[in-house]
């Protein structure tokens, strides 16, 4: 997200101490709201008791990065929308998980799918790109009393190794990124491995070559496309229609 010059000025004039950031002076309401949006996107949260914004880490480091680049990453820029619990349960059921299976979650977010798979008794390797999500993910795993491998990297840059029994995922959708992520994820499965993924409903009706080839792949891998109810991700901040795709490697 690009940041306007007046908000950059506000951040430049702010004072920091440890994980605390205090804005200087009395800001016009609209300007404050825009500055607050940027601070929250950088993981700063208003603390009423402290009367300042508090960050998970060093506030100066977070603000300096924003000022230097003139932008801040928000989760939705990377297509991150948390998976609602009812859909997590459906994914786990479709994956036919049993204890001891080795599972890959390529867009692990903040751990909704990972923790559920760990509770089944699976061994889970997680990939996540956003630092804020990685912090939340590792915290969720630890709080649930489990261990899992977490790697902060762009999943599409990882060379595939066929070592997983299952892949369970909710990838980004923008510009048909979900197809690219699922195609790459299939390369990580052992023979007879199962992939289940939330995807955009566009895979059911779009007619471009990428979509046609993907539907052929679903058919070739004993797959199915299961429509989800409209508004399934409303609580996560999007009304995009979604499906679950299941495939079995042969």
Regions found by a protein language model. Give the residues of each.
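Class I S-adenosyl-L-methionine-dependent methyltransferase catalytic core
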Residues: 1-250
């Amino acid at each position: 997200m690009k940041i306007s010059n007046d908000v950059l000025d506000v951040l430049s004039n702010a004072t920091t101490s440890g994980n605390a950031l205090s804005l200087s002076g009395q800001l016009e309401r609209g300007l404050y709201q825009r500055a607050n949006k940027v601070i929250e996107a950088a993981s700063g949260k208003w603390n009423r008791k402290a009367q300042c914004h508090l960050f998970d880490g060093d506030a100066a480091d977070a603000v300096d990065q924003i000022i230097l680049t003139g932008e801040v990453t928000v989760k939705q820029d990377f297509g991150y929308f948390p998976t609602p619990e009812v859909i997590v349960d459906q994914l786990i059921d479709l994956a036919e998980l049993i204890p001891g299976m080795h599972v890959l979650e390529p867009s692990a977010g903040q751990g909704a799918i990972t923790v559920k798979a760990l509770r089944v008794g699976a061994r889970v390797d997680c990939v996540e790109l956003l630092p804020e999500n990685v912090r939340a993910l590792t915290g969720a795993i630890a709080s649930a009393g489990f261990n899992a491998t977490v790697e902060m990297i762009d999943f599409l840059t990882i060379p595939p190794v066929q070592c997983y029994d299952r892949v369970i995922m909710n990838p980004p959708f923008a510009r048909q990124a979900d197809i690219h992520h699922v195609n790459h994820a299939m390369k990580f499965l052992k023979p007879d491995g199962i992939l289940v993924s939330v995807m955009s409903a566009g895979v059911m009706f779009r007619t471009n070559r990428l979509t046609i080839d993907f539907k052929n792949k679903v058919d070739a891998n004993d797959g199915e496309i299961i429509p989800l109810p409209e508004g399934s991700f409303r609580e996560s901040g999007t009304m995009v229609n979604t499906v679950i795709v299941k495939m079995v490697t042969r």
